[in-house]
Amino acid sequence: MNTLTEPKADGIGDSCRRNSRPTGVLREWRLVPRGCFAKAASAGWILLAGPRSMNSTILTAIARLGERGAVRVLDGGNRFNAYTVARAAHGRPEVLERITVSRAFTCYQMLSLLERTPTIQVPFVVLDLLSTFYDESVQVGERKRLLRACISHLNRLEQAAGGVVSVHPPAVPNPAALELLDILQSAAMDTFHVQMATPAPEPMRLF
């Protein structure tokens, strides 16, 4: 395991612990900006696991990718904020037009989105993939089946272009959620465990 230390909080975070799958080599992922979000220059997909506070930086990175070309966003946790992306793109319509967004509100819809996503040379970003899989009204075994089916489509899509998948911990940790994360992490080419910088406390004012 390698530890990446970022000098400032304008990246995803101050530190990212990286786990690499022994098979497969990620030839060129560039940090955008100086965090653990990357642009794929070769086939593969990476997993970003961390707090929800990292989402705004991921959206900024999506805007950066849009500056270079088309990018597909699949939103599993209603995390895509068009205003944040537009601000990061400085309101340039040509950048925003290159970003396509699809949303899923159940784990079944997430699988359906991935099934319908064509295998083309356009990088993809899946936001908060496990959000809908935390739904306890769906049996754990069924959630695992759906997740493995989603992974098969991520692997299909990575053959044409790289991608990034983000996940956040559930509000209430539980064994089923951890098992789902383990399944996803085992399938990813690389995993970055993101820790956001904690702002320094303001000094106490006596007067």
Where do the language-model regions lie?
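Short, well-ordered secondary-structure micro-motifs
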Residues: 83-85, 112, 135-138, 176-178
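Detector for small/aliphatic-rich hydrophobic stretches
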Residues: 1-71
